[in-house]
Swiss-Prot record:
Protein location: Cytoplasm
EC number(s) given by UniProt: 6.3.5.3, 3.5.1.2
Single Gene Ontology MF annotation: phosphoribosylformylglycinamidine synthase activity
NCBIfam families, A to Z: FGAM_synth_I, PRK03619.1
Pfam families for this protein: GATase_5 (PF13507)
Protein name: Phosphoribosylformylglycinamidine synthase subunit PurQ
Organism of derivation: Staphylococcus aureus (strain MSSA476)
Length: 223
């Protein structure tokens, strides 16, 4: 398995994503936003940061980058796509995930560890966790308030697309939502950073199982 780690101007978690992929036992390669092909890749990791300086709004300018059409193609083919923080914002901007990310209710940038609950462990991203398991991931965002209409929220609930919730909501997200998947279950977006939760020495290794779950799910289908 080989992941493409996208790199935009202002990305600052691309190396963490790369490290997470390698740590889970697969290949990874950095891919510049100006590239026009993801041929040969089995999945996409869209890292956090401040793509294009968050001008207009977070993820807006990245959403029209040349590489995005290929991200959509891989998603349509059922390949795993994970967007974290700014990556989540980009996924909502390009329509692969519903809703939007707004300014935190506090209007402050939040940077700390947060306790989260796995509320759906039947996905390619969470199948190594226990249902209801509590995990610790770092958060680092100013626009992490997940918002959606009541209609979209009911669809998310009906389709079990909500996979991760905050235990102590730090940003005002609708129903404490921290992470969701698309209807097909192969595209995932979350504001917390599992790629920064790989070592107990750094405070938490709760994120290891998320990347291992992605690899496990892919291998079950292809090996």
């Amino acid at each position: 398995m080989k992941f493409a780690v996208l790199v935009f101007p202002g990305s600052n978690c691309d190396r963490d994503m790369f490290n997470a992929a390698i740590k889970s036992g697969v290949e990874a390669e950095y891919v510049d936003y100006r590239e026009t092909s993801l041929s040969g890749f089995d999945g996409v990791l869209i890292p956090g940061g401040f793509s294009f300086g968050d001008y207009l709004r977070s993820g807006a300018m990245a959403s029209v980058a040349p590489i995005i059409s290929e991200v959509k193609r891989l998603a349509a083919e059922g390949k795993p796509v994970l967007g974290v923080c700014n990556g989540f914002q980009i996924l909502t901007e390009i329509g692969l995930l519903p809703g939007a990310l707004l300014h935190n209710d506090s209007h402050l940038f939040i940077s700390r560890n947060e306790e989260l609950e796995i509320v759906n462990n039947q996905t390619a991203f969470t199948n190594l966790y226990e249902q209801g398991e509590k995990v610790i991931y770092p958060v680092a965002h100013g626009e992490g308030h997940y918002y959606c209409t009541d209609e979209i929220y009911q669809q998310l609930k009906a389709n079990n697309q909500i996979i991760l919730k905050y235990v102590n909501n730090p940003n005002g997200s609708y129903d404490d939502i921290a992470g969701i998947v698309n209807k097909k279950g192969n595209v995932c977006g979350m504001m917390p950073h599992p790629e920064r939760a790989l070592e107990t020495l750094l405070g938490t290794d709760s994120g290891v199982k998320l990347f291992e779950a992605m690899v496990k799910s892919w291998r079950e289908q292809h090996v």
